[in-house]
Amino acid sequence: MIKRKLERYLQVLNNIDDPQDKFVWIMDFGKNSRPMSDSLQVREFEVPGCQSQTWLVPHFVEDKIYFTADSVALISKGMVCLIADVYSGSSAQDIREFDQKEFDKMNLNTLLTPGRNNGVHSMLKKVKFYAKKEDNKVAV
């Protein structure tokens, strides 16, 4: 399921030729994503290593993890919401086993600054962290 969702976004982004238009698409994705409750914008859910405050919250439902995400910067919000959508509804095991290098196919290194690219890697690490903690049910 993770790979299928990611491939859907890759197809959309690969059909956009202009890098600036890709940038706008990612920001629009964030703008159109559901806002996160202010009560969840706490240090526990903050993604370290992002240039802007960014939050990623896991919700454990039966054997699946669903994510809510937000950021104060539109490009970060777009990326974290896209990542949240790709992984939401997956089992912790599927998340742990998925090769996050698949995200490299988005070629974000040509689109984002090095600092923003580091932020994306931090978002992906946070997802893996939650998948490893799944048995402890650390979140809401």
Positions of the model-derived regions?
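N-terminal intrinsically disordered, cationic/polar leader segments
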Residues: 2-53, 60-65, 106-140
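A general alpha-helix detector
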Residues: 8-9, 79-82
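Solvent-exposed interaction patches of small proteins and small membrane subunits
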Residues: 44-51, 71, 93-98
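Conserved interaction-surface patches within small, structured recognition/assembly domains
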Residues: 59-75, 84-88
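Glycine-rich phosphate/pyrophosphate-binding loops
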Residues: 89-106
